[in-house]
Amino acid sequence: MAKAIPKKGSRGRIGSRKSIRKIPKGVIHIQASFNNTIVTVTDVRGRVVSWSSAGTCGFRGTRRGTPFAAQTAAANAIRAVVDQGMQRAEVMIKGPGLGRDAALRAIRRSGILLTFVRDVTPMPHNGCRPPKKRRV
Protein backbone atom coordinates (compact mmCIF):
# COMPACT_ATOMS: atom_id res chain seq x y z
CA MET A 1 0.00 0.00 0.00
CA ALA A 2 1.30 3.41 -0.94
CA LYS A 3 1.32 6.07 1.74
CA ALA A 4 -0.79 9.16 1.18
CA ILE A 5 1.33 12.22 0.55
CA PRO A 6 0.38 14.98 3.00
CA LYS A 7 -0.62 18.27 1.35
CA LYS A 8 1.55 21.21 2.18
CA GLY A 9 -0.12 23.91 4.26
CA SER A 10 -3.37 22.01 4.85
CA ARG A 11 -3.95 22.67 8.49
CA GLY A 12 -7.50 22.34 9.82
CA ARG A 13 -9.88 25.20 10.32
CA ILE A 14 -8.66 27.42 13.11
CA GLY A 15 -11.92 29.05 14.27
CA SER A 16 -15.49 27.90 14.13
CA ARG A 17 -17.10 28.44 10.76
CA LYS A 18 -20.39 29.89 11.95
CA SER A 19 -20.31 33.30 13.53
CA ILE A 20 -22.74 34.13 16.31
CA ARG A 21 -25.14 36.62 14.79
CA LYS A 22 -27.40 39.03 16.63
CA ILE A 23 -31.07 38.19 16.34
CA PRO A 24 -33.27 41.03 17.65
CA LYS A 25 -36.59 39.48 16.52
CA GLY A 26 -37.64 35.87 16.07
CA VAL A 27 -40.45 33.34 15.92
CA ILE A 28 -41.00 30.72 18.63
CA HIS A 29 -42.85 27.59 17.52
CA ILE A 30 -44.40 25.38 20.22
CA GLN A 31 -45.65 21.98 19.13
CA ALA A 32 -47.52 20.38 22.02
CA SER A 33 -48.68 16.81 21.46
CA PHE A 34 -50.03 14.53 24.16
CA ASN A 35 -46.69 12.68 24.29
CA ASN A 36 -44.09 15.45 23.96
CA THR A 37 -43.57 19.21 23.59
CA ILE A 38 -41.11 20.60 21.03
CA VAL A 39 -40.02 24.26 21.15
CA THR A 40 -38.20 25.66 18.11
CA VAL A 41 -36.85 29.22 17.89
CA THR A 42 -36.25 30.63 14.40
CA ASP A 43 -35.32 34.01 12.98
CA VAL A 44 -37.89 35.92 10.91
CA ARG A 45 -36.72 34.17 7.73
CA GLY A 46 -37.40 30.74 9.23
CA ARG A 47 -33.84 29.58 9.89
CA VAL A 48 -33.63 27.53 13.09
CA VAL A 49 -31.57 29.19 15.81
CA SER A 50 -32.32 26.93 18.76
CA TRP A 51 -34.63 24.07 19.64
CA SER A 52 -35.46 21.86 22.59
CA SER A 53 -37.96 19.19 23.51
CA ALA A 54 -39.08 17.48 26.68
CA GLY A 55 -37.20 14.36 25.55
CA THR A 56 -33.89 16.18 25.12
CA CYS A 57 -34.30 17.71 28.58
CA GLY A 58 -34.12 14.24 30.11
CA PHE A 59 -37.80 13.39 30.49
CA ARG A 60 -38.72 9.89 29.34
CA GLY A 61 -41.97 8.01 28.84
CA THR A 62 -45.21 9.55 30.05
CA ARG A 63 -43.38 12.36 31.87
CA ARG A 64 -42.56 13.98 28.50
CA GLY A 65 -46.18 15.04 28.06
CA THR A 66 -46.40 16.89 31.38
CA PRO A 67 -46.61 20.69 31.72
CA PHE A 68 -43.41 20.79 33.78
CA ALA A 69 -41.48 19.05 30.98
CA ALA A 70 -42.83 21.61 28.49
CA GLN A 71 -41.81 24.47 30.77
CA THR A 72 -38.26 23.07 31.04
CA ALA A 73 -38.02 22.57 27.26
CA ALA A 74 -39.15 26.14 26.59
CA ALA A 75 -36.69 27.56 29.11
CA ASN A 76 -33.81 25.60 27.52
CA ALA A 77 -34.66 26.78 23.99
CA ILE A 78 -35.06 30.41 25.07
CA ARG A 79 -31.83 30.53 27.11
CA ALA A 80 -29.67 30.20 23.98
CA VAL A 81 -31.42 32.97 22.01
CA VAL A 82 -31.51 35.46 24.88
CA ASP A 83 -27.70 35.27 24.86
CA GLN A 84 -27.78 36.14 21.14
CA GLY A 85 -29.76 39.30 21.86
CA MET A 86 -33.37 38.39 21.07
CA GLN A 87 -35.76 40.97 22.50
CA ARG A 88 -39.04 40.48 20.60
CA ALA A 89 -40.72 37.34 19.34
CA GLU A 90 -43.91 35.98 17.84
CA VAL A 91 -45.28 32.73 19.23
CA MET A 92 -46.98 30.04 17.14
CA ILE A 93 -48.66 27.31 19.18
CA LYS A 94 -49.67 24.04 17.52
CA GLY A 95 -51.31 20.96 18.99
CA PRO A 96 -53.68 19.90 21.78
CA GLY A 97 -51.11 18.90 24.41
CA LEU A 98 -50.87 19.74 28.08
CA GLY A 99 -47.67 21.73 27.59
CA ARG A 100 -49.19 24.63 25.63
CA ASP A 101 -49.82 26.99 28.53
CA ALA A 102 -46.77 25.94 30.54
CA ALA A 103 -44.40 26.60 27.63
CA LEU A 104 -46.02 29.99 26.99
CA ARG A 105 -45.69 30.88 30.68
CA ALA A 106 -41.97 29.99 30.60
CA ILE A 107 -41.45 32.21 27.53
CA ARG A 108 -43.25 35.14 29.20
CA ARG A 109 -41.03 34.73 32.27
CA SER A 110 -37.84 34.85 30.16
CA GLY A 111 -38.13 38.59 29.52
CA ILE A 112 -38.72 38.42 25.76
CA LEU A 113 -41.44 40.82 24.58
CA LEU A 114 -44.14 38.85 22.74
CA THR A 115 -45.60 40.75 19.78
CA PHE A 116 -48.41 38.24 19.27
CA VAL A 117 -49.43 34.70 20.15
CA ARG A 118 -51.14 32.71 17.41
CA ASP A 119 -52.77 29.26 17.53
CA VAL A 120 -51.85 27.43 14.32
CA THR A 121 -53.30 24.02 15.20
CA PRO A 122 -54.36 22.33 11.95
CA MET A 123 -58.13 21.84 11.83
CA PRO A 124 -59.66 19.53 9.22
CA HIS A 125 -62.61 20.71 7.16
CA ASN A 126 -64.08 17.23 7.69
CA GLY A 127 -61.10 15.44 6.17
CA CYS A 128 -59.88 12.02 7.32
CA ARG A 129 -61.90 9.84 9.66
CA PRO A 130 -60.51 10.14 13.22
CA PRO A 131 -59.23 7.07 15.08
CA LYS A 132 -61.73 5.10 17.14
CA LYS A 133 -62.29 6.07 20.76
CA ARG A 134 -60.19 4.24 23.35
CA ARG A 135 -61.84 1.71 25.65
CA VAL A 136 -59.86 1.35 28.85
UniProtKB/Swiss-Prot annotation:
Where is this chain's protein located in or outside the cell?
A: Plastid, Chloroplast
Sorted keywords for this record are: Chloroplast, Plastid, Ribonucleoprotein, Ribosomal protein, RNA-binding, rRNA-binding
The record, for Pfam families, names: Ribosomal_S11
Q: Which GO terms describe its cellular component?
A: chloroplast; ribonucleoprotein complex; ribosome
- Which InterPro entries does the annotation name? Ribosomal_uS11, Ribosomal_uS11_bac-type, Ribosomal_uS11_CS, Ribosomal_uS11_sf
Q: How does it assemble?
A: Part of the 30S ribosomal subunit.
GO aspect biological process, one term: translation
Q: Which domain of life is it from?
A: Eukaryota
Give GO MF terms, alphabetically. Answer: rRNA binding; structural constituent of ribosome
Protein name listed in UniProt: Small ribosomal subunit protein uS11c
Keyword Transferase tagged: no
Q: Which family does it belong to?
A: Belongs to the universal ribosomal protein uS11 family.
